[in-house]
Amino acid sequence: MPDVTISIWTAVVGFFLSFLAYFFKKWCPSLYVYILTAILGIGWIVYVFLDQGFIKTVPIFFIFVFSFFSSPVPERSKVQLQEIIDQLKEQGAREIVLSKNKERLLVDFLFSGLFIVIAVLYFLFGPDSPITLILLYSFVSLVVGLTKRVELFRALRLFYAEHEEVLYAVSLFETKKYPLEELSEVSVQTRPDVLQLFQLFSLFSPNMDYTTSMGKTWKLSFSGEKVYFTPDPSESMAFLLKEEIHKMEEVEVKPFYHQNNWKRLLGKWYFAATVKGVGAYAALITLFTLMGIGPIVTTIVMVLFWIFNLWISDRVLKIALDMKKIDDPDLLPIIEKVFSRAGLSHVDIYVTESAEYNGFAIGANIGRSLVALTSETLKLPHEAIEGILAHEAIHVKKRDVLMGQLLRFLLIGLVLAGVFLFYKAFQNWLEHAQIFVFLSLWLLIFLLPAFQSLFTQWMEVRADHLGATLLDGGNAQMANSLTILCEYQDRALEKSAGYYVTFEKEQEANKKDKKISSLERDSWFFRFLEFQFMSHPPMYWRVHSLQTTETGWSIGKIKLWWCSRFRESLPN
């Protein structure tokens, strides 16, 4: 592993060069600026190579690339931003004054600060391990997120263009336009629900958080995106719902520190520290290191802690994702029918709020499992929801969540054991063969997700075909369910991408871009990536395999998937 100090300085250099490029582009052609930053970046990498050696320089290089491209550099200059604002005003757009209070920023700094402190303590006192790189990635991401939040707080402007019926959100980092014709739901909260908005407390893509105070918050649900903002109390928002606006009731949101939110706060923090990140593991390792506890005991405790987290994963995620039991009287008979046929009448079905279309199973075994659907998924036709539920029911019945975690643990354990034994056997030779060691390590990194994909895709294909046996329509209904799911998701993604405001040249290029459907057979390279490295086979193949085979699961279908996995990964 590379030196922690060098790793942090590399991230700083990446940030610095990114900002340097941003400022120099105001006076110099972009090509010259990129050449200059490339020379400076290569110079830093060469310095690290001479100081750290070949193997340690490789992760340093990726740290540099990540920090350079993820740095919070504005998308536009202030001049370009002002041009957009002036153009909106010339067109008669009305500015919506925002309520601003630094308390909102302090909450983000408080939440992020807890995880940043854990990372810093590990950097200072923790042992040298791969966790260092994971924490550094999280550290950089949090710093970038905080920087963007500060800039958003300082410079965000909202406009409503009445002639277009479009809401504009204008900032240095991005400018978006939201047509009110895509607005499906409006609600008002007494304050922003920061436990829902903070980036580490969400499993899905983060919401568009434009909140700049702890006051009354408007939540707008557009196709593919949910937007939150805090207008000044003096602003009239009647344009959003016309006559219905006066009939709306405010949704009361308690402060995050309120007694009623303690369970949510703890659950979301635990989720961020154990599921979405490694903060809890890093904190324990740092504590054990300071106490002088040896690596063997530390490793045993970490494994037991991982097993414990797997065991309580259903309860943690239920709290962290604010799940609620589905009580729709139209859906309850469908749920009862599907899960009774699967022999799983005791499994609870929940809904979690998200703009994505998705469903997933949670839990270490049948007795502690649940199935969750996103709020957008519940808007699909009932026949499609039935197919999604049948797919997830098979995951629960076959204990796929538990098996997937155990297989991942087993694969990583075998790789580490193999590396350790190989190093012990050829230690003297390996110390003089750094190129071989480097290539071998990257081959293992390359093959690990491929092996994992092999098992997870088999589980997904099995869930499709066995799930079809729970449906009245069999394979045809399951294929139709997946098709509808993809069509809705693709449409939402297209709408979300269309909210970005670009300059005329960029708009011309975007118009020429071909829209790619998830149901269409892609080029061989992307098919190769999906079949060999992703957890799910490509959707076009899943639908096709259902449409061209009989309902049921057999050795023949395993052979079909196995052959397609390699045949479809080859050039046409």
What are these regions (language model features)?
Residues 1-16:
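Hydrophobic transmembrane alpha-helical segments in integral membrane proteins
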Residues 2, 17-39, 43-127, 225-227, ...:
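N-terminal membrane-targeting/pre-transmembrane regions
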Residues 44-47, 116-132, 280-297, 412-431:
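Juxtamembrane "helix exit" motif at the C-terminal ends of alpha-helical transmembrane segments
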Residues 50-80, 122-155, 295-320, 444-455:
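Transmembrane alpha-helices and immediately adjacent membrane-cytoplasm interface residues
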Residues 86, 155, 161-164, 235-282, ...:
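Polar-ligand-bearing catalytic/cofactor-coordination segments
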Residues 138-187, 327:
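Conserved beta-hairpin
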Residues 152-154, 170-228, 354-370, 378, ...:
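Non-transmembrane, membrane-adjacent beta-strand/coil modules in membrane-associated proteins
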Residues 421-425, 431-456, 463-466:
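C-terminal structural cap/anchor segments
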